[in-house]
């Protein structure tokens, strides 16, 4: 059984997406036990439409929902101990859940997660890892927004955590790791990036295979299993890729409807276009993973639909099933000489 707590009020659409999304995920993974945190008045009728989900869940009424535009500091002051987001995270501390999934305000979710769960021993700052579609399948890119201007040691830690996530998600024994840079030559790039490369290379970590520097176009090619960068450039790369995918989809839609011949051609090529559309569907890779915390936190896109939110739940399910937290702790212990924590410290 995998116990998953949900911030039902999070995201642009709240329970109208979270509840049917959870129902879809339950169809795929019948061994999930959901712990739902939300405002009962908005959720009770929606839950009644999904009897299997209702039977596999416990519901906790919460008086506060964190707004999508709330500042993290305000969300902490107003929602600590009361909001659906806080309570969903704290369910990990209370040993009611193995992972939390929220589509809520990213800044507030990160602030509450750090405050409530704390960072793992040896980790200075957490990272957000994104699953990225590539020509070879999928890769992991981190950090995509949590730590702006990470230093060399933090990039080293990101490499360790990204490698552990790749082993958990892709079941690769020794995933390849590359540092995002402006060129592949050793003399190029910021000093922090060059120093991080030296740290990773000299550490010779058992769980990762250091590839060296990679450039932006290597991400989509799938040159490495894990791409490491700091949060500013990582977030720009993520948003640029999402925008490019939408742009290509619009180009194709316009081209296929421009003339009668194009529409006829589309009929014959529909299967190929459907496969392309599925490959480029952002819902399939929804679910950023907060790494470096004493608990697994999954961030869904705020505007995700039910299928997209279900995909984020899928990511959380896989991370628990494949022992992500234990893998990260073991790698950090080997590198930092620390012992894996016995229990999650309470906030």
UniProtKB/Swiss-Prot annotation:
It is found in: Cytoplasm. Gene3D superfamilies: Isopropylmalate Dehydrogenase. The keyword Cell membrane does not apply. GO terms for cellular component: cytoplasm. Pathway: Lipid metabolism; phospholipid metabolism. It holds the Pfam family FA_synthesis. It comes from the Bacteria. NCBIfam families: plsX. Homodimer. Probably interacts with PlsY. This is Phosphate acyltransferase. It comes from Rhizobium meliloti (strain 1021) (Ensifer meliloti). The gene is plsX.
